[in-house]
Every structure is written in structure tokens, then in C-alpha cells.
């Protein structure tokens, strides 16, 4: 397994095991298979586990699989979707969420604690779901005035090694956070050949994921690439029911030419998509959404094969799938 430096967190594996598939939030999976996949990931050289309370059973499975005794060098992340509560509640909610996550995983600290909310500037109106934005998005005043100092306190207390933001919010707000006087230590940024956040995108402005990753790298942050297969849109088939107008389903249809290209090469599209993401500039580690050992083995083999050939990257880019 190749490694990279994840900002101030130091050396990590190029692949991170994400918690969504392990936690049983998409596709079919059993508890036994999830536990076996966790162990197989570390055996395969993965050194980062990316968890969150929103990933259903993920944190509990990590606790059960390792009993609080992770192998040396393995790093764990977790998250909290804060939204925009009253300012006086921000620190308490972050602390309570972290405490619950640590108890579930049987750990005393995590290496990285993410704000799992979208981020928006004060007064911003989302194109989709604006009436409910306080549930899924943190406004700038709360972020700057409450989240940043609360994260600093948790870091000073030793309960977290570092903190970060999930860079799926409004790009203007995310980029401001990356340039703020007190910056996060890491960001999770969209990293796929379509530059698409899919159903995560609730705003109308361009997503600008490569710009976000570049800004983070330039400012010394670690960058974790997420949605390498765009929620299944870049695989041979989506593993869960989706409505016809779901953006992930729309992306799957748009990616028909990509699957045809992979068929010409005799390659699995999911493996090609992961190898493309691994070759993207400014991405330190790619977070996998696998849910079983077979999918994990494919990704491990893809990482071992290395990046795509320049001609392959050019052929993919020539399909014109990347969002503007």
C-alpha cells in the first residue's frame, strides 16, 4: 500500500476505509461481513478508518471488531452533523457527539473530528431544502464564532488529534474556511472523474472540488477524497433503489460512455474510477465506500496497480463528464 502525508496528521495509506458501506447504509451487508471487512482492510494495508454516527452501525462495529485496541499506526476519524443550532449549544453538541462516538468505538480519542454539516455564508439560500437548512448546514457566524473555538478546545484536551470540515457545502463558504486565520487540519473533498457531488449538491453554483482540494493543499491541510465512484454512478450498477430524478441516478446515466470505455479496456468501472481518483492532484487518501471483502479486494488491487496511464486519463476526460 502506497502512503501519503495527510497534512499535520502525518503518513497514511492512500486508501481509507469509509464507514457508509460498513455501517450498512447502502447495499446489502451483514454484520459478520462488515466486521470481517474491517479486519481485512487493516490486513490489506489501510491505516485510516473514517467513521460517523450517521453511518448507522459503523462506530459500534469498529468497537466490536477491535475492542478499543487498534493496531499501531491506525488512525480513526469521526464526525458530527451540527447544523445551525443556537450558539450556546454548539460546543455541548460537539462534545456530546464525540463522547458517544468514543464510547461506541471503545476509544479514548480520535485522530480527526469532522464537522459533518454543509457550510454556508450568512443569509445564503439553498436551491434545494432551504427551509430545512438549519438541520444540515452550519452558517458562517456559528462556524467562525463557535465551531472553530470548540474544536480547538477539544484538541487542547487531547480528545481529538485534529479537526476538519466536510467540504461538500457551498464552495464559497468552504473556500473561505480554508483561508480563515484559524484553519481546519483537514478537509474531505469530492474526488471523482465527474467532479460531481451528486445528490449532496443543494446549491446552484459550480461545485469546484478540484479548487477546494488545491486550496487545502496550498494551505497545508490534509485532503481526503470522497465519492470516488460518485455514490455508485461510476460503477457497473447502483446497489440501491433510486428515484428516476435522483442526481446520482442522473449521473449513472450520464456515465454510460465511461462504462463503455471501461468495457473496451476489459476493466471494471469501479476500479478504474478509484484509480482515477488516486491519480488526482492534491488528494492524499481516497475514502472507499465498500461494504464487503469482495469490493475491498477490488479496490486494494486497483491501488496496487497504480494510477491510470496518461492516455486512459485523457480518454476519460475527453468524455466531457466533469461538471463545469
Feature locations, PLM:
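Acidic-and-aromatic substrate-binding clefts and catalytic sites of carbohydrate-active enzymes
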Residues: 26-29, 52-61, 83-91, 120-121, ...
Amino acid at each position: 500500500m502506497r502512503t501519503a502525508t495527510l497534512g499535520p496528521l502525518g503518513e497514511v495509506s492512500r486508501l481509507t476505509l469509509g464507514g457508509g458501506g460498513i455501517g450498512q447504509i447502502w447495499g446489502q451487508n451483514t454484520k459478520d461481513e462488515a466486521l470481517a471487512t474491517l479486519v481485512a482492510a487493516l490486513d490489506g494495508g489501510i491505516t485510516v478508518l473514517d467513521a460517523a454516527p450517521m453511518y448507522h452501525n459503523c462506530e459500534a462495529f469498529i468497537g466490536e471488531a477491535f475492542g478499543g485496541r487498534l493496531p499501531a499506526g491506525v488512525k480513526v476519524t469521526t464526525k458530527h452533523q451540527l447544523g445551525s443550532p443556537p450558539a450556546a449549544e454548539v460546543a455541548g453538541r460537539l462534545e456530546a457527539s464525540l463522547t458517544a462516538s468514543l464510547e461506541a468505538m471503545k476509544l479514548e480519542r480520535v485522530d480527526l473530528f469532522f464537522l459533518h454539516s454543509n457550510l454556508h455564508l450568512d443569509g445564503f439560500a439553498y436551491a434545494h431544502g432551504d427551509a430545512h437548512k438549519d438541520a444540515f448546514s452550519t452558517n458562517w457566524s456559528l462556524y467562525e464564532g463557535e465551531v472553530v473555538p470548540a474544536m480547538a478546545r477539544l484538541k487542547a484536551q487531547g480528545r481529538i488529534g485534529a479537526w476538519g470540515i466536510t467540504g461538500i457545502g457551498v464552495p464559497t463558504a468552504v473556500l473561505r474556511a480554508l483561508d480563515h486565520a484559524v484553519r481546519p487540519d483537514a478537509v474531505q473533498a469530492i474526488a471523482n472523474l465527474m467532479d460531481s457531488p451528486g445528490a449532496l449538491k443543494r446549491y446552484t453554483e459550480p461545485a469546484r472540488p478540484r479548487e477546494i482540494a488545491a486550496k487545502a493543499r496550498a494551505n497545508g491541510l490534509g485532503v481526503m477524497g470522497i465519492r470516488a465512484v460518485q455514490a455508485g454512478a461510476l460503477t457497473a450498477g447502483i446497489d440501491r433503489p433510486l428515484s428516476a430524478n435522483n442526481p446520482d441516478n442522473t449521473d449513472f446515466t450520464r456515465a454510460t460512455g465511461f462504462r463503455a470505455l471501461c468495457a473496451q479496456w476489459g476493466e471494471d468501472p469501479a476500479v478504474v474510477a478509484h484509480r482515477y481518483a488516486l491519480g488526482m492532484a492534491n488528494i492524499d487518501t481516497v475514502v472507499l465506500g465498500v461494504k464487503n471483502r469482495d469490493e475491498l479486494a477490488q479496490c486494494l488491487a486497483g491501488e496496487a496497480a497504480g494510477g491510470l496511464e496518461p492516455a486512459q486519463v485523457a480518454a476519460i476526460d475527453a468524455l466531457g463528464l466533469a461538471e463545469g
